[in-house]
C-alpha cells in the first residue's frame, strides 16, 4: 500500500488511518536494522524497494532507501527518526570506549571539535573534548575549566609516585627536553604519571630539569650510590685530578729519543726541493708553526713509548728562596729540595705538563699505531702538516696552498692503489691530524726538551737548525 496511489488519498478517513498506522509502527521501529548503518542522510528520495513491512505482518511505510549507504531506514527529520536516534545515542553511551586523556596535554588550538565523543563512561555528557592537531586524540581544550581541573588533579597525584620514575642514568643532568611524553602514562602499580618528558638525547622518559619532581630526591640508596655510578673523567676533563703535574719516569732515555726524532724531522724538511726554494724567513715561519706536529708524527713512526710519574709542585717557601737567590746573585746556598739541573729554569718560571696534556699525546700515538701507517703515508702526512697556507705571516700563500693540495692528491692515489675499496683509509689518515689540535707545543718542549736545552727558546733552536748543516 505504501507504493500505490489510492483514490481516497487526501480525504479525512485516509489521514486518520495513516496517522494511526504511524502510531502503531513507531514502537516497532527499533526492530529495524539499526546496527551502525547510515543515520546521517537527509534525502530519502527513493522509497523502500520490497520492504513493505516487518516481521509479524506489521506494516512500516516510513522506510526510505538511502542514496549513500543503500540501506532502508527512516527519513531524517521525521518523528520516528528523532525518537530512534535519541534512543540509540542513550543506549550506546555506556558502551563508548574510554576517552584517552593520556599523552598530549599541551595543545592549545582545539580547532577541530571532538568527533564521535559525545560523553564519558557513565553517561556524563562532555562537550569540551576537542581533536588535538598534534596527537590526534580527543581531550579538553587548554584553558577550559575541565582542562584546569583534570591537569591540576593529575599533577597532584604524580608527586608521590615521582621517586619510582626512571631517572635515566648518566643523562639525568641534561636540560634539553624538546619532546612531549612518549606514551608512558603510568608507573608500576597503576599510579598515573604525566610529568615525564622524553629526553632528546637519551630517548628516555624522566622528569624535566628544574621542575618540582626533578628536585625531589629519588631514594636514599640512589643518593649513596651516585658517586659509584659516575663515569671516569676523560683526559680532556679538567676536573678530578686531570690537572695534576707529571714528569717523565725515565727522562734521560726519552729526551734523547725525542732529540733524535727532532733532528730527523728537520733533516726531512730541509732537504725537500719544494721547501728549499722558499726564502729563509718563510721557511722559519712554517717550521716554527708546525715543528711540534711534525715531531709527533716522527715519534709515532719511531714508536716511542714513555711513562710519567706524578710530581708535587714547589711550595711557597721554595719559590721565595729561589727568587731571593736570583736577586742576590747566587751568593746564598740553595736548600736541598730546590736543587735542579744547571740548565733548567727556575721552578716558578716553568709550566709543568699536566696529566691530561700528556694523555692527549699518548692518545695520538695510539691512534697512529692502530692504523699501521706506512713510511710513505707518514711522509705525505708530514707534507700536509708542513705546507699549511693558514699560517700567520706567510707571504707565498698560493704556492703553499698548491703544495698542500698536491700532497693530499698523492696520498689519495696511494691509498686507492694500496687499499681496495672506498676512500676509508684516506679519511682515517686525515682524522689523525685532527688529534694534533689537542697537543700544545709548549707541553712538548717542557716534557721532552727542557731538561736538555734549559732556558733556550724552541724558536731559537729552529733558527739554528735551519741555518746549520745537520
Curated annotation (Swiss-Prot):
InterPro entries membership: NHR-like_dom_sf, NR0B1/2, Nucl_hrmn_rcpt_lig-bd, Nuclear_hrmn_rcpt, Nuclear_receptor_repeat
Domain of life: Eukaryota
BP GO terms, sorted: adrenal gland development; endodermal cell differentiation; gonad development; hypothalamus development; Leydig cell differentiation; male gonad development; male sex determination; negative regulation of DNA-templated transcription
Any one cellular-component term (Gene Ontology): cytoplasm
Short sequence motif named LXXLL motif 1, residue ranges: 13-17
Disease: Adrenal hypoplasia, congenital: A disorder of adrenal gland development characterized by absence of the permanent zone of the adrenal cortex, structural disorganization of the adrenal glands, adrenal insufficiency and profound hormonal deficiencies. AHC patients manifest primary adrenal failure usually in early infancy, and hypogonadotropic hypogonadism leading to absent or incomplete sexual maturation. AHC can be inherited in an X-linked or autosomal recessive pattern.
PANTHER family: NUCLEAR RECEPTOR SUBFAMILY 0 GROUP B, NUCLEAR RECEPTOR SUBFAMILY 0 GROUP B MEMBER 1
Subunit structure: Homodimer. Interacts with NR5A1, NR5A2, NR0B2 and with COPS2. Interacts with ESRRB; represses ESRRB activity at the GATA6 promoter.
Protein name: Nuclear receptor subfamily 0 group B member 1
Amino acid at each position: 500500500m505504501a507504493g500505490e496511489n489510492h483514490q481516497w488519498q487526501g480525504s479525512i478517513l485516509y489521514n486518520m488511518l495513516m496517522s494511526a498506522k504511524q502510531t502503531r509502527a513507531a514502537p516497532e521501529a527499533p526492530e529495524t536494522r539499526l546496527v551502525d548503518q547510515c543515520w546521517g542522510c537527509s534525502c530519502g528520495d527513493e522509497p523502500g524497494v520490497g520492504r513493505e513491512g516487518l516481521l509479524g505482518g506489521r506494516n512500516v511505510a516510513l522506510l526510505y532507501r538511502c542514496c549513500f549507504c543503500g540501506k532502508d531506514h527512516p527519513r531524517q527529520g521525521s518523528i520516528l527518526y528523532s525518537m530512534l536516534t535519541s534512543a540509540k545515542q542513550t543506549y550506546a553511551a555506556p558502551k563508548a570506549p574510554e576517552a584517552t586523556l593520556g599523552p598530549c596535554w599541551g595543545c592549545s588550538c582545539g580547532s577541530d571539535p571532538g568527533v564521535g565523543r559525545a560523553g564519558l563512561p557513565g553517561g556524563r555528557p562532555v562537550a569540551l573534548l576537542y581533536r588535538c592537531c598534534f596527537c590526534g586524540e580527543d581531550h579538553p581544550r587548554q584553558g577550559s575549566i575541565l582542562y584546569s581541573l583534570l591537569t591540576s588533579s593529575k599533577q597532584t597525584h604524580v608527586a608521590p609516585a615521582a621517586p619510582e620514575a626512571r631517572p635515566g642514568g648518566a643523562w639525568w643532568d641534561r636540560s634539553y627536553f624538546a619532546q612531549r611524553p612518549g606514551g608512558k602514562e603510568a608507573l608500576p602499580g597503576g599510579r598515573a604519571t604525566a610529568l615525564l618528558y622524553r629526553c632528546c638525547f637519551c630517548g628516555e622518559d624522566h622528569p624535566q630539569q628544574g621542575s618540582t619532581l626533578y628536585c625531589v630526591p629519588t631514594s636514599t640508596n640512589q643518593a649513596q650510590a651516585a658517586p659509584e655510578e659516575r663515569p671516569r673523567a676523560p683526559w680532556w676533563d679538567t676536573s678530578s685530578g686531570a690537572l695534576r703535574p707529571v714528569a717523565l719516569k725515565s727522562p734521560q732515555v726519552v729526551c734523547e729519543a725525542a732529540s733524535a726524532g727532532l733532528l730527523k724531522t728537520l733533516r726531512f724538511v730541509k732537504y725537500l726541493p719544494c721547501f728549499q726554494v722558499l726564502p729563509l724567513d718563510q721557511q722559519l715561519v712554517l717550521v716554527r708553526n708546525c715543528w711540534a706536529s711534525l715531531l709527533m708524527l716522527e715519534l709515532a713512526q719511531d714508536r716511542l713509548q714513555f711513562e710519567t710519574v706524578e710530581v708535587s709542585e714547589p711550595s711557597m717557601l721554595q719559590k721565595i728562596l729561589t727568587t731571593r737567590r736570583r736577586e742576590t746573585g747566587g751568593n746564598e746556598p740553595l736548600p736541598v729540595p730546590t736543587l735542579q739541573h744547571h740548565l733548567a729554569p727556575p721552578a716558578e718560571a716553568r709550566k709543568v705538563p699536566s696529566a691530561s696534556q700528556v694523555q692527549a699525546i699518548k692518545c695520538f700515538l695510539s691512534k697512529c699505531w692502530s692504523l699501521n701507517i706506512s713510511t710513505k703515508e707518514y711522509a705525505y702526512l708530514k707534507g700536509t702538516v708542513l705546507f699549511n697556507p693558514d699560517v700567520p705571516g706567510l707571504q707565498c700563500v698560493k704556492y703553499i696552498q698548491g703544495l698542500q693540495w698536491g700532497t693530499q692528491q698523492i696520498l689519495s692515489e696511494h691509498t686507492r692503489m694500496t687499499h681496495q675499496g672506498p676512500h676509508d683509509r684516506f679519511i682515517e689518515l686525515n682524522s689523525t691530524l685532527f688529534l694534533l689540535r689537542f697537543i700544545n707545543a709548549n707541553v712538548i718542549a717542557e716534557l721532552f726538551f727542557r731538561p736538555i736545552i734549559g732556558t733556550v727558546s724552541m724558536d731559537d733552536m729552529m733558527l739554528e737548525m735551519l741555518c746549520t748543516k745537520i
